[in-house]
């Protein structure tokens, strides 16, 4: 079947609705929607939940942008895209909880297509989800990765190991020599064997995110914590900011190509702190995190 951008867009709009409903059901607070238009073509729906019962901030963004020509920064790496009109669409979300025992989570699914008359379209899917705990719980990490593995299995035995490895490699802070979190799945440039297969996989990843995340939220959201744990959470959120502003390709691409800054930076935590040469106390749960987030096989 030839690529159907309209079908993908409808799935993404429904996915945004569903995830917002699921997060509201856990939290009690409602999302505020900000619809926006892009002068050069397209627009989106940014939805933010702030200061809820469970989530300090949750942002779920849908965007669909299109244009007559790709920016030079994109065609430099992909000369085959020169002279083509394009559509790029996706849902991207980040959830920052109040409770330090509840991990931060991120998910993204996206579709890109570039066309010109008389030529086959160039298209691909990308996406994934990853988890950033502040305090490590093995049962949470196992559940997260088991859910990821199980949704991949119908698409092949090698899919989960390949996309887990890619996730571990992508969410890595070179300047800190550490992982951002415990990973999950990351894929890009997916266009084989055919559109239907790739679209089905993207749908499985999009739907699988809440299956992976919400049971962990329910398990941890009522755990008691104090100022000590909160301070550590805010310190570790600094790593999230560092990754997004220094290494994340999506953030950099969006900012360099005139994307909507408010939506791009919606992933930022509302509060964060840095501390010069911070060293956690030896043997403490905070010190244990550096070992916990090292790459390993969780399932």
UniProtKB/Swiss-Prot annotation:
Chain sites annotated for binding substrate: 92, 108-110, 258-260
The keyword Cytoplasm is annotated on this UniProt entry: yes
Signal peptide range in chain numbering: none
Keywords: Cytoplasm, Heme biosynthesis, Manganese, Metal-binding, Oxidoreductase, Porphyrin biosynthesis
EC number(s) on file: 1.3.3.3
Cell compartment(s), UniProt: Cytoplasm
PROSITE patterns in the cross-refs: COPROGEN_OXIDASE (PS01021)
Main location: cytoplasm
GO molecular function, one term: manganese ion binding
Cofactor: Mn(2+)
Annotated active site: 106 (proton donor)
Disulfide bonds: none
Site (Important for dimerization): residue numbering on this chain: 175
Chain positions recorded as Mn(2+) binding sites: 96, 106, 145, 175
Gene Ontology, cellular component aspect: cytoplasm
SUPFAM superfamilies reported for this sequence: Coproporphyrinogen III oxidase (SSF102886)
Pathway: Porphyrin-containing compound metabolism; protoporphyrin-IX biosynthesis; protoporphyrinogen-IX from coproporphyrinogen-III (O2 route): step 1/1
Assembly and interaction partners: Homodimer.
PANTHER family registered for this protein in UniProt: COPROPORPHYRINOGEN III OXIDASE, MITOCHONDRIAL (PTHR10755), OXYGEN-DEPENDENT COPROPORPHYRINOGEN-III OXIDASE, MITOCHONDRIAL (PTHR10755:SF0)
The protein, known as: Oxygen-dependent coproporphyrinogen-III oxidase
């Amino acid at each position: 079947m030839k690529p159907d951008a309209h079908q993908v867009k409808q799935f993404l709009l429904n996915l945004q609705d569903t995830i917002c409903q699921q997060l509201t059901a856990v939290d009690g607070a409602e999302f505020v929607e900000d619809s926006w238009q892009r002068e050069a073509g397209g627009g989106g729906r940014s939805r933010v939940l702030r200061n809820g019962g469970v989530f300090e901030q949750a942002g779920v963004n849908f965007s669909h942008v299109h244009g007559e020509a790709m920016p030079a920064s994109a065609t430099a790496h992909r000369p085959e895209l020169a002279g083509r009109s394009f559509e790029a669409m996706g849902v991207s979300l980040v959830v920052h909880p109040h409770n330090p025992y509840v991990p931060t989570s991120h998910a993204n699914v996206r579709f890109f297509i570039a066309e010109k008359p008389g030529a086959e379209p160039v298209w691909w899917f990308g996406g994934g989800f990853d988890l950033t705990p502040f305090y490590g719980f093995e049962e949470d990490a196992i559940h997260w990765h088991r859910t990821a593995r199980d949704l991949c299995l119908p698409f092949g035995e090698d899919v989960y190991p390949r996309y887990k490895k890619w996730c571990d490699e992508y969410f890595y802070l070179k300047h800190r020599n550490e992982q951002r979190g415990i990973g999950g799945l990351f894929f890009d440039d997916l266009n084989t064997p055919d559109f239907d297969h790739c679209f089905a996989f993207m749908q499985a990843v999009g739907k699988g995110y809440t299956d992976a995340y919400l049971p962990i939220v329910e398990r941890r959201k009522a755990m008691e914590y104090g100022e000590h744990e909160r301070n550590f959470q805010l310190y570790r959120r600094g790593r999230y900011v560092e990754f997004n502003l220094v290494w994340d390709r999506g953030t950099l691409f969006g900012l360099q190509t005139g994307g909507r800054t408010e939506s791009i930076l919606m992933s930022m935590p509302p509060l964060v702190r840095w501390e010069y040469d911070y060293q956690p106390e030896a043997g403490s749960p905070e010190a244990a995190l550096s070992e916990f987030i090292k790459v390993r096989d969780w399932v």
